[in-house]
Amino acid sequence: MGKFDGVLIASDFDNTMVYTEGALRSGGPVPAISRENRDAIEYFMAQGGTFSVATGRALPSFASVMDGVPMNGPTVLFNGAAIYDFPAGRYLRTAFLPECIRDHVRQLSQLMPGLTYEIYHDDNSISIELHIIVENGVNLPAVCRSIMNE
């Protein structure tokens, strides 16, 4: 029996396990996981622990940056809307929004023109709409991603 048998740790990826803010802002490559984090995760798993990542990213977005991240548990994607088994290449559980969400969001957008939203599709396809977000009294241009215009 290992020291961590029966223990599950699920870590966020962006800016928790790996500092990605700079890469996301610049469009550059996401840095690799630090040696210290990798060693700690590998030790935890070697001692019987189950390690997973829980991220807000969609499947294609996380798959593109997960190389080098040691995991022996399923991955939580879409801010908890899906659990994915990378070795098996399949979803274990999903709670995706129904297709009618497009109509509902379109109606809300007509009723509330300033509404800002972000909706990811399973294949990571998105269209772009420009909105203005007010943060601390300052108008900031923001890109709002949606699947509305498919």
Predicted regions, residues:
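Residue-level recognition of short loop/turn positions
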Residues: 1, 14, 87-88
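Solvent-exposed alpha-helices and their adjacent loops that cap or buttress functional pockets
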Residues: 1-2, 69
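Glycine-rich phosphate-binding loop signature in dinucleotide/nucleotide-binding domains
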Residues: 2-3, 111
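Asp-based phosphoryl-transfer active-site loop
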Residues: 5-27, 53
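A short, polar/charged loop-to-alpha-helix boundary motif
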Residues: 25-36
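Active-site phosphate-binding/coordination module
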Residues: 34-138
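Acidic, His- and aromatic-enriched active-site or binding-groove loops in soluble protein domains
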Residues: 133-150
